[in-house]
Amino acid sequence: MAGTPTSGRIVEIDIAKGMACLLMIAAHFVSARLIPFGTFAAPLFFACSGMNTMLMLEKTRGNRCFDFFHLFFPLLLFFGGSTQVVIAHGGGLRIVPGFLQCIALSLLVLLLLGRVFRNSFPVGCLFPVPFLIHLLLPVSLSASFRGTPLAFLYGKGFALFPWLGFFLFGVFILRWPRQRILPLLAALGTAAVAALALAGGVPRKFWMSPAYILLALLAVSLAFALARRITGGADRAVSRGVAEFFALPGRNALMFLYLHYFLLRYFVSVDFFPHFCLYLIFETLYLFCACWVLLRLYEKAKLETTLLFPVIFLTLALGTLRWGGLLKPKGAPPMVDLAVGMLFAFLYVLLRRKFASRCERGMAAAG
């Protein structure tokens, strides 16, 4: 998820992921008051993760050192992502089909598909498969899967089927010819309208309905097309400013995920606007801007790889105090949970940078 020296940065992907971050704040802030099915933050976030992952797989193909890299960091995200589950839902540390667990498993699937297909476009063309599996499997299966490893494949929450489809669609839309984006948008829009008309109700996000799938694919396509449009105007000061406004959170998305919980918990203002829609718009922008400022400071700190061992020590020490029941103040755990989560995000990025740099040096020496 985080950038590394090898992965490079595709600006339009960072911009689109930044848009997903903005939608994430809106989704968690508004809850069910205005949009019962949330926003399309997760599909867009997942699609951008699929793009970045496939690009890095292509760039590091042939370097055996990166084979371990591509296995280790999804596993680290899978288990370390339990800190996000605690922050979002409370309770103790546990491994469930959560947001980061879905990302980790999907990255491993992309790694496998990247080994099977030399060209990434056929990988992207598989995006309907997870959705079809989800729609064809009986809902009753989820009850028997609950509490077992199979729940990560199918069930409540961010199960691999159907959410893997958005990672694959990200690869698809990345390789789709730019000049043919309008016919694709028209086809998705027509299909989404038809699905909404047939459904006759609110699209279901979890136990995903066909209407939600098509609307989400349309939203991802529109966001990425807009991101490309913004990038295309990078010679103008306004376009560059807008690009950086979204790209900064996009290239620091893991830290943003944890940071936005902190702001939602402690920085939300009272509703003093005459209409809730105004409150939603301005509060979302205010929280996003607050995240942006903090991420600007963080982006400088993450370049300091000398912080790796102090961050490891602090994460382990704080985690031991929290989960060992050794904290004295009763109100401390929520704040400490946030601190441990943000430290994990920082540690994850530092480790990736360190590991990628070492792999690159090994490749240069071998060459």
PLM regions: where:
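Alpha-helical transmembrane segments and their immediate juxtamembrane cytosolic regions
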Residues: M1-G367
